[in-house]
Amino acid sequence: MNQLTGQLVQYGRHRQRRSYARISEVLELPNLIEIQTSSYQWFLDEGLREMFQDISPIEDFTGNLSLEFIDYSLGDPKYPVEESKERDVTYSAPLRVKVRLINKETGEVKDQDVFMGDFPIMTDTGTFIINGAERVIVSQLVRSPSVYFSGKVDKNGKKGFTATVIPNRGAWLEYETDAKDVVYVRIDRTRKLPVTVLLRALGFGSDQEILDLIGENEYLRNTLDKDNTENSDKALLEIYERLRPGEPPTVENAKSLLDSRFFDPKRYDLANVGRYKINKKLHIKNRLFNQRLAETLVDPETGEILAEKGQILDRRTLDKVLPYLENGIGFRKLYPNGGVVEDEVMLQSIKIYAPTDAEGEQTINVIGNAYIEEAIKNITPADIISSISYFFNLLHGVGDTDDIDHLGNRRLRSVGELLQNQFRIGLSRMERVVRERMSIQDTNTITPQQLINIRPVIASIKEFFGSSQLSQFMDQTNPLAELTHKRRLSALGPGGLTRERAGMEVRDVHYSHYGRMCPIETPEGPNIGLINSLSSFAKVNRFGFIETPYRRVDPETGKVTPRIDYLTADEEDNYVVAQANAKLSDDGSFLDDSIVARFRGENTVVARNRVDYMDVSPKQVVSAATACIPFLENDDSNRALMGANMQRQAVPLMQPEAPIVGTGMEYVSGKDSGAAVICKHPGIVERVEAKNVWVRRYEEIDGQKVKGNLDKYSLLKFVRSNQGTCYNQRPIVSVGDEVVKGEILADGPSMELGELALGRNVMVGFMTWDGYNYEDAIIMSERLVKDDVYTSIHIEEYESEARDTKLGPEEITRDIPNVGEDALRNLDDRGIIRIGAEVNDGDLLVGKVTPKGVTELTAEERLLHAIFGEKAREVRDTSLRVPHGGGGIIHDVKVFNREDGDELPPGVNQLVRVYIVQKRKISEGDKMAGRHGNKGVISKILPEEDMPYLPDGTPIDIMLNPLGVPSRMNIGQVLELHMGMAARYLGIHIASPVFDGAREEDVWETLEEAGMSRDAKTVLYDGRTGEPFDNRVSVGIMYMIKLAHMVDDKLHARSTGPYSLVTQQPLGGKAQFGGQRFGEMEVWALEAYGAAYTLQEILTVKSDDVVGRVKTYEAIVKGDNVPEPGVPESFKVLIKELQSLGMDVKILSGDEEEIEMRDLEDEEDAKQADGLALSGDEAPEETASPDVERDAVTKE
């Protein structure tokens, strides 16, 4: 054994685990939700300021008035977080901006503080509360603005290239070659033009100027031959015709159009990242590397020769020349005339021999953009010329094409930037309004407040939080789901990809994902590979690129230093990186001579002196959820993906239990998820209650501990999460404990002693039992039901609102028509259910009546009206009732009244919210899973006495099918099973970190230590007969979780219910209380059996024969024979469809008589005409009125 394995490691205050790690951790895991919090913090500190600087000053059309934004401040939130949730409001703070209005004529300056709306504030846990619902803004992966070159092969097999200049916002520039070796340019996706047209338009009018600039070559000659414009003016007109077809072109218009398209910073923005990427790509050194010079390089200051003509620039020479390159070698000033560009253009150009030329005589120009400052955010003529030069260089074999799936070319837009973009849209709309108002209103009396209209700003922010694809309702099933959701990276969304267009390449795992994006955790289904998760150690840099930490190797000594560098994907491409498991001596030098390392996605073996960096940790590859799977290295990746995804669906149990076999990641995940209560300052616990913990702060003054303030931490008690699971916190510290900053004071849901605890440790045997675990089904002992091992608490929220209707206000009352006293027994005098009452399906929760329409009065009613003066108030019962499957215990009732000053939506006078809590024991049909993607449905719950038992008489808890293991190749579950059994006997907990956990030998040694046999199998006895089974069976402790797919939520039955308006067929789905569709294939089955009457009944009275279904219902109620079915409504719809196409459709009987179609009303009229009027209690059934889908039988 390695000296590290078998050490006890402390996780938090309460838990020790025996760790099987061989590699010591050199870097603490970062705060896992930092990606959210730091991005939002940047937005508040810098992002907003940038926006206000970009937009100010706003000047009117004459340039007389100017409005500047000077400073801004955020006030305090109106309500605290919990109260915002309760009141259904947004957790936000008022944004006030200091604005200055300057009148240049009079020199008058007015300063004013302007309120710019309430701005949503991020909570400490990285979420937003919007209208009372907790939401998360997911980070978006997009292509970075830059210039991209890529190869293409046309249909004749000829190789060519395409290039694209992609800005953050603005017009795209695309270059491409065709079959005849002509180079074309497209401006903003219009038709293509020869690239020389663009050069002429910039101000290089003659052929000779262009040849001098780019360098003589055959591709340029072909392009010039194709180009039929001779000078700048014609080129400008040509471009104008392409961009604005149909408008009369003039040279001046064309100049201003091109100028505004590309060189106006307001219209064209590369952002910081775009300028950085373009400077990097167009830097001349990348194209000079390993090329043969066609001119001598001389230091312009001293005249010293740096490199001879004909010399090859290898890495050494290039490193020597580099400082001089940036200092002015090859710099050229160009003076374009007659085109868009008025000023001189600075370029850097060096001649080299073309590597593709056989004789080696052809020279080509390599042009760089001469290091433009980062402050210039728009594209410059130098950028355009050097990108064209790069394109011609590529045709001669100089330069590299780009891989757009490389993470060096994809960046993250996190919360801050997404908000900033949205805010920019609002501000630019506001700017337009300000300009208009400046020109309309009187300049002397005007104030900043009158100019500024904050509506567009508020609207754009509201729209973003409310309806953007990236603003998502937080997945709050358990703390891990919360954590993962905040670390999610999506390639979808505005400005991103769409599911349909995304091909295989985008979705695939790329070598640059290493340590940045998890290769395992991604959804199954249409979004696979488009939604990813951030790796555990990854950070995001200021440009939005994902960085991962590496340990620096000192190039002089070859030792691994304690210094840690964060590298982006394209920086990493320049280095050789060793794996985290490379063997090191105590002083940090490599023990082996040859070392397995990575270089640009290739795994190679290199000499130890060639290593530049070393991985920080084996788990830096995977995400937080994947790092919670022990023995991950023994699982197939497809199953690991399911394991990582299913942990997020674990339902918090009543008595959670941390895994006996963990990975050591449980503590960090639990702490950072935001579900636990974290101590903010060091101190001593003074008082602990179920709902609150009080901590007395300690201040260090001159080395003495001095008592400070008393902090009160409130705990959540039985709160409904977004997904209807129960969020409940319990204190785990006791009075007198000294606590430090960052310590866990109270466990959240699915946590035990500060560790994530999604399920329970149960005794599992791999064996079949009378075929009940066919197809991954699970057989379970009744003990798990009886002892509430897998019992979870679910809270559902129901609301009823009393509105103003056209006929009068609705009223919440106990006085409901046609409801007996028995049904009202649990309602209080207001008509609202009492807390603690037990309710079943269909019980009243809130009594509510709605005024009915005024109907024509009968003679009797008119008489009563004449005598008593008041018509008996006509009301309908619209009470809130418990839906199917929603019964439980009333946990809480909240009442909001407009009179009491509560903010309610317009038209609502009173709102009642009722929370029903259910205790759900595990039952047949529930879905369960392990952590290795081994999922199944419970098929049978056996009495404890029938379960197989161990030699000491202990019955096992769960039986799994052994056939579920070999084909799925998730062997990790078997190792977990054995390790768990050994740990149970030894009374310890175990940490087996991913990719660095217990090996087979460790498992066997631990088994022997626990006194078990090496194969960990045992004799089992049949609980029914007491006979031993023929073979020994693998039995052990496995961590099993109960998933959110519970049979109680899926069970559904209907006899009558709502029908669709057009076809009159029952609706579908449990949510609509729909029926089971009897489709085309099912009809074939009945036809095959010749079950004619069953089939007729299904297609008519049980579906859309409107008349027939009412009559059938009546007949069943009265006990009569069921009448003949009529014509299905969908047949009538078909006839109408044909009639709408202009066909005259008649239905004829067998003897050519026309059959008349009759509606329900016609039937009733006919009956009444025949003197068969219905008695009062069987009034004619109303068909569904066009505005409401209703139950045709119970009329609800």
Swiss-Prot record:
It comes from the Bacteria. Its EC number is 2.7.7.6. It is an enzyme of class 2 (transferase). It catalyses: RNA(n) + a ribonucleoside 5'-triphosphate = RNA(n+1) + diphosphate. GO terms for molecular function: DNA binding; DNA-directed RNA polymerase activity; ribonucleoside binding. This is DNA-directed RNA polymerase subunit beta. The RNAP catalytic core consists of 2 alpha, 1 beta, 1 beta' and 1 omega subunit. When a sigma factor is associated with the core the holoenzyme is formed, which can initiate transcription. The keyword Disulfide bond does not apply. Residues 1152-1196 are annotated as: Disordered. Residues 1152-1165 have a biased composition (Acidic residues). The keyword Transferase applies. Residues 1187-1196 have a biased composition (Basic and acidic residues). CDD domains: RNA_pol_B_RPB2. GO terms for biological process: DNA-templated transcription. It comes from Bacillus velezensis (strain DSM 23117 / BGSC 10A6 / LMG 26770 / FZB42) (Bacillus amyloliquefaciens subsp. plantarum). One of its GO terms (cellular component) is DNA-directed RNA polymerase complex. PROSITE patterns: RNA_POL_BETA (PS01166). It holds the Pfam family RNA_pol_Rpb2_1.
